[in-house]
Design a protein with these regions (language model features):
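Conserved SGNH/GDSL esterase-like catalytic core that processes O-acyl groups on lipids
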Residues: 28-32, 38-122, 131
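Bacterial N-terminal signal peptides
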Residues: 10-22
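Conserved catalytic region of serine esterases and O-acyltransferases that act on ester linkages
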Residues: 179, 202-257
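N-terminal secretory signal peptides that target proteins for export/translocation
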Residues: 1-8
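A generic secondary-structure boundary signal that marks alpha-helix termini
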Residues: 22, 57, 227-231
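Alpha-helical cap/lid subdomain in secreted, periplasmic
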Residues: 82-208, 212, 224, 233
Length: 257
């Protein structure tokens, strides 16, 4: 799998990603997204659904809980998130932490402990009501390089985008491995884009949240991982022109193969 070779994560994670087999014997009927604004901005669940439909597959029921800025631990106390999990009968459940949470976890033991324990508890609760659910951890992306030029940068998320992405990859990989879940490498595709000769601006002006083109890229990767499609090329591309859509499809294919 290219992601493990290209980005050279720790050896155990490389083996995990290389050997992870397709997890879905049939198309899922019910998909749940639990996250925050990185899922909610541009309505990723709806974009994912459009990508699925335009591929000619039966559209699943898709629901979500995406209150802004929430950590995995906070979702355990959010009635809306817990109600959806307890509804049960989910085929796929996507879990996404606060955008800086896994990066801060690298250097902050308390944040790391909370992240690991909360991920495990969410998985436990999902499986209590949906025993056959495939759980996906949504690897998000580093801040835009301009974030590090600001006078006030906030908590320690790494010295630059490369270090921040490495932290996100590592800790989402850890919780995926520890909880027998799927790792969805959206952030790695963003990194490929920004390392390319003519990168597309995927971040909004806040250097954090996704433009629609970034959300489209994420949706392609979710489609590819959940449906075991190595080269996602849906007919639907929303507001993107054909050239942009094909470019994003290429980045998605690189992390899916």
């Amino acid at each position: 799998m290219l992601i493990a070779m290209r980005f050279a994560p720790t050896s155990w994670l490389a083996v995990f990603l290389l050997t992870m087999l397709p997890a879905f014997a049939s198309d899922p009927q019910r998909v749940l997204f639990i996250g925050n604004s990185y899922t909610g901005v541009n309505k990723l669940p709806e974009v994912f659904l459009e990508v699925v439909k335009s591929s000619g597959r039966q559209a699943p029921v898709v629901k979500s809980s995406t209150p802004g800025g929430r950590t995995l631990k906070q979702h355990l106390g959010i009635a809306g998130s817990m109600k959806l999990i307890e509804e049960g009968g989910w085929d796929v459940v996507v879990l996404q932490g606060q955008s800086q949470e896994p990066a801060i976890a690298e250097a902050d033991e308390a944040v790391r402990k909370e992240f690991l324990e909360s991920a495990a508890e969410l998985c436990r609760r999902v499986r209590a009501k949906s025993p056959k659910a495939k759980i996906c951890f949504y690897e998000t992306w580093a801040r835009h390089p301009d974030y590090w030029k600001a006078a006030k940068k906030g908590p320690d998320v790494g010295a630059n985008p490369k270090e921040m992405q490495a932290r996100l990859r590592k800790w989402y990989g850890v919780v995926a491995k520890d909880n027998a879940a799927m790792f969805v490498p959206c952030g790695d595709a963003w990194e490929l884009n920004y390392a390319s000769a003519a990168p597309v601006r995927l971040h909004t002006s806040d250097h954090s949240h996704p433009e629609f083109v970034g959300t489209y890229l994420n949706a392609l990767i979710f489609f590819g991982r959940i449906y075991d499609v190595k080269v996602p090329a849906p007919k639907w591309s929303g507001k993107l022109d054909e050239a942009q859509a094909r470019l994003m499809q290429g980045f998605a294919a690189q992390v899916l193969n």
